[in-house]
Amino acid sequence: MGNEVPRASSFQMLMLLLLLLLLRAERLRGAELTFELPDNAKQCFHEEVEQGVKFSLDYQVITGGHYDVDCYVEDPMGNIIYRETKKQYDSFTYKTEVKGVYRFCFSNEFSTFSHKTVYFDFQVGDEPPILPDMGNRVTALTQMESACVTIHEALKTVIDSQTHYRLREAQDRARAEDLNSRVSYWSVGETIALFVVSFSQVLLLKSFFTEKRPINRAVHS
């Protein structure tokens, strides 16, 4: 009986830490957004970042055209610190030199009819340590603390994997729907062409078996 109470208390503490780690992992994902980018259009986003802070940008085109987009990032002085054209996906990490509003834009201006769907994940700063004074402590982690760190890393891996598979599933579904539409249109076109050819052959065969009777006209002197 005496050992069951500490075990129950330790189990409750571990479950509480797991819940906090789960909420923390979700909160530390940063700004994620999936948006529509019309043809011949540009969409920009702004974020104020302190000096000496690292930020990262990951993006991927989910649907539309050749699954490509133009992207560039500007610092507060208007200088281009990143530019790529017609990229399907990419990642960019940068440590700021000045404080101010940084702007990153996605452009579909090179396309005149392809509508795009773009996903991006924008994160600012380094992830804080899971445990207080974790970077400065000289003692070894306890078994529970080590378990929490391991679980936290596993949760991060799970979240990243879920995001990857979610984007991949959305992209594959869009391609399948586009292929299905093309097959449907092609089938309708073949049906119409087959009907026209069949009708023409019937008329041609009918003309072969139609007797042409001479027309007698009276000649008046």
UniProtKB/Swiss-Prot annotation:
Residue pairs linked by disulfide bridges in the UniProt entry: none
Keyword Phosphoprotein attributed: no
**Domain GOLD per the UniProt entry, residue ranges:** 42-124
Q: How does it sit in the membrane?
A: Single-pass type I membrane protein
Q: Name the residue ranges of motif: COPII vesicle coat-binding.
A: 208-209
Please list which residues make up the signal peptide. Answer: 1-30
Homology family: Belongs to the EMP24/GP25L family.
- Protein name according to UniProt: Transmembrane emp24 domain-containing protein 3
- Lineage of the organism: Eukaryota, Metazoa, Chordata, Craniata, Vertebrata
Q: Which gene encodes it?
A: Tmed3
